[in-house]
């Protein structure tokens, strides 16, 4: 598994960005092959982070490009700065997702 963390700073309206990411962008990510998970975090103080997991690095790179395009086309006034991206092979997982 390959995981990508995108950290956006200077977000103007985090609540709106999170809502739109879940409603509009998440379905696009979910439709990509090899997709096991997508999380959006409102970290406060104008910081929003997303965590995306894929079965392969290629799928993650494709998702990164799709994310950049979606932000530029849909919320450029709310997310004025490019994200700091951290990505790599997932070396350990423990998850318990409530229903």
Question: Predicted regions: what is each one?
Answer:
Residues 1-49, 55-69, 76-99:
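Short S/T/G/P-rich N-terminal loop/turn motif that feeds into the first structured element of a domain
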């Amino acid at each position: 598994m390959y995981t990508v963390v995108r950290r956006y700073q200077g977000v103007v309206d985090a609540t709106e960005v999170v809502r739109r990411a879940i409603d509009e962008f998440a379905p696009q990510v979910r439709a990509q092959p090899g997709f096991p998970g997508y999380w959006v975090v409102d970290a406060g103080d104008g910081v929003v982070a997303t965590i995306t997991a894929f079965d392969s690095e290629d799928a993650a790179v494709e998702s990164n490009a799709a994310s950049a395009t979606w932000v530029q086309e849909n919320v450029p006034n709310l997310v004025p700065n490019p994200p700091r991206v951290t990505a790599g092979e997932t070396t350990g997982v423990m998850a318990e997702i409530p229903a």
